[in-house]
């Protein structure tokens, strides 16, 4: 297995572990796991997959759990995700699913 694949696998494991740890209530340990995953990503020059990149706050490294550490709002087809720890906001444009109800 290539080294970059091993690094990516470890990054994913750390982010998953951080999410589980945050659910149990230990946010400080969860932040440390995410910081470590970010460090692996930078040192190994490996991109964090988009699915996992969206799982944590980029300002305070807190795992985003809806209702616990994150608030979600939809305003005019824009999803606004707000970290409840540091008030960092990220906006995503909501688009129609590619395969559903296409008009010909």
From Swiss-Prot:
Superkingdom classification of source: Archaea
Pfam families: Rpr2
E.C. number: 3.1.26.5
UniProt keyword annotations, A-Z: Cytoplasm, Endonuclease, Hydrolase, Metal-binding, Nuclease, tRNA processing, Zinc
Main location: cytoplasm
Localisation per UniProt entry: Cytoplasm
Required cofactor(s): Zn(2+)
Catalyses which reaction(s): Endonucleolytic cleavage of RNA, removing 5'-extranucleotides from tRNA precursor
UniProt-listed InterPro entries: RNP4, Rpr2/Snm1/Rpp21
Gene Ontology CC terms: cytoplasm; ribonuclease P complex
Cofactor: binding details: Binds 1 zinc ion per subunit.
Binding sites annotated in the UniProt record for Zn(2+): 57, 60, 83, 86
BP GO terms, sorted: tRNA 5'-leader removal
Molecular function GO terms recorded: ribonuclease P activity; zinc ion binding
Residues spanning the signal sequence: none
Paired cysteines (S-S): none
Functional summary from the UniProt entry: Part of ribonuclease P, a protein complex that generates mature tRNA molecules by cleaving their 5'-ends.
Family: Belongs to the eukaryotic/archaeal RNase P protein component 4 family.
Quaternary context: Consists of a catalytic RNA component and at least 4-5 protein subunits.
Name of the protein this chain belongs to: Ribonuclease P protein component 4
Organism: Saccharolobus islandicus (strain M.16.27) (Sulfolobus islandicus)
């Amino acid at each position: 297995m290539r080294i970059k694949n091993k690094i990516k696998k470890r990054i994913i494991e750390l982010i998953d572990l951080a999410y589980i740890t945050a659910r149990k209530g230990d946010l400080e340990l969860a932040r440390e796991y995410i910081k470590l995953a970010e460090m692996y990503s930078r040192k190994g020059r490996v991109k964090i997959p988009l699915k996992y990149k969206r799982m944590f706050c980029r300002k305070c490294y807190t795992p985003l759990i809806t209702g616990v550490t994150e608030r979600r709002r939809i305003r005019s087809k824009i999803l606004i995700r707000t970290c409840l720890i540091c008030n960092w906001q990220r906006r995503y444009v909501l688009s129609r699913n590619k395969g559903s109800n296409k008009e010909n």
